[in-house]
From Swiss-Prot:
Transmembrane segments: 19-39, 44-64, 81-101, 109-129
Location in the cell: Cell membrane
Residues forming coiled coils: none
Ligase found in the keyword field: no
UniProt name for this protein: Folate transporter FolT
GO MF, one example: transmembrane transporter activity
Protein function: Folate-binding protein that interacts with the energy-coupling factor (ECF) ABC-transporter complex. Unlike classic ABC transporters this ECF transporter provides the energy necessary to transport a number of different substrates. The substrates themselves are bound by transmembrane, not extracytoplasmic soluble proteins. Binds folic acid with a dissociation constant of 9 nM; binds polyglutamyl folates less well. Upon coexpression with its energy-coupling factor (ECF) ABC-transporter complex EcfA1A2T in Lactococcus lactis subsp.
Membrane topology of this protein: Multi-pass membrane protein
Subunit text: In Lactococcus lactis subsp. cremoris (strain NZ9000) forms a stable energy-coupling factor (ECF) transporter complex composed of a membrane-embedded substrate-binding protein (S component), two ATP-binding proteins (A components) and a transmembrane protein (T component).
Listed NCBIfam families: ECF_S_folT_fam
Length: 172
């Protein structure tokens, strides 16, 4: 039994429409973030998880990277830093590896969310902020604490959402 998925579905017109809807959902949900620039909380992870669940690691990563660039072009008053695009793509790729074509379980959801929070949110985003001039010593602990607090919350919300999607998926 393969634990992680490395496949993506065929890119059909229907799949492109679904992907575009999830990308729009991610942009809208991303606008509801709050916190400081280096410590944000946002519900946009719902769309990222659904991209990974439906489209696998490769298409989800590409869509997340494209979506990050679209968000920057539409909303960002500042300069673009490609590190955040890499983080978004890696998060979507990890969700795709854990969820695409796999049965949703609490353990799988906990591992997926934990890996994304550790790799993308704590390690990479802190690195990108440090490269941009924010001292990592001042942000690593608040970012780590925030992500530890978010782990059970995001896991529960993700699991509930994916189980609901799993029930309605045959009817789509």
């Amino acid at each position: 039994m393969q634990v992680l998925s490395f496949s993506s579905p065929k890119l059909s017109t229907r799949n492109m429409v679904y992907m575009a809807m999830l990308m729009a959902m991610q942009i809208v949900l991303g606008r509801f973030s709050f916190g400081t620039p280096w410590l944000k909380i946002s519900p946009a992870f719902f769309a990222t998880i659904l991209m990974g669940y439906y489209f696998g690691p490769w298409l989800a990563a590409g869509a997340a990277a494209l979506n990050d660039q679209l968000s920057i072009m539409i909303f960002s008053p500042g300069a673009n830093f490609p590190g955040f695009t890499i983080s978004a793509a890696i998060a979507a790729m990890l969700y795709g590896m854990f969820f695409h074509g796999k049965k949703v379980t609490v353990l799988r959801t906990l591992l997926a969310v934990g890996m994304v929070l550790l790799i993308s949110n704590i390690i990479l985003t802190t690195l990108w902020l440090n490269i941009m001039g924010t001292p990592w010593q001042g942000i690593i602990w608040p970012r780590t604490i925030k992500n530890v607090v978010m782990l059970p919350i995001q896991t529960a919300l993700s699991y509930g959402t994916l189980k609901a999607i799993e029930r309605i998926r045959p009817h789509l």
